[in-house]
Amino acid sequence: MKIAFLTAGGIAPCLSASIGALIDSYNQLAPDAELMGYLNGYRGLLLGNNYDFPSSVRQKTDILFKYGGSPIGNSRVKLTNIDNCIKRGYVKEGQDPLKVAADQLVNDNVSILHTIGGDDTNTMAAQLSFYLKQHQYELTVVGLPKTVDNDVYLSLIHI
């Protein structure tokens, strides 16, 4: 099983600790699972830029609890803003960013994607989850809220 993380939106103190806590949890619950992060959020997902967490990192997560920000970087990319994704070179003309993201997850053999961010990040996670289900991709997307605005309204959405 391969589990991926991405952080998106604005930089916040909880991002690094969230990744550390997820790694610690998977170390206990699924020690054989492969863990990776998409570099710079949804941009990294679209471009296929990722980092596999080696065992040396998985065993030293305590450092992730000491620093804010995100060790895998953030970006503000909306998968539903096709024109912006094309303009920035994340997808080519005629491509659907949701499909590009879904196909990248499949190419990377990801079973579970954890997205960590605010309302836009979680809206994109819901859109991606809906797209995956609608097109019979066998993947799970889990959104982890990171917001000081209290603007992530639903804690559980069944699609």
Task: Pin down the residues of each PLM region.
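Glycine-rich nucleotide/cofactor/substrate-binding loop typically near the N-terminus or early
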Residues: 32-108
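Short Gly/Thr/Asp-enriched flexible loops that form oxyanion-binding sites at enzyme active sites
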Residues: 18-22, 117-135
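Short, ordered loop/turn segments at secondary-structure junctions
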Residues: 8-10, 38-44, 76-77, 118-121, ...
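N-terminal phosphate-binding or glycine-rich loops at protein starts, especially the Walker A/P-loop
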Residues: 1-50
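Short, acidic/small-residue loops that bind anionic groups at enzyme active sites
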Residues: 129-154
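Conserved small/polar residues in nucleotide/adenosyl-binding loops
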Residues: 157-159
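Short glycine-/acidic-enriched loop or helix-start segments at secondary-structure transitions
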Residues: 15-16, 47, 124-126, 153
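Short glycine-rich or small-residue beta-strand-to-loop segments that form or flank ligand, phosphate
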Residues: 2-12, 71-73, 111-117, 143
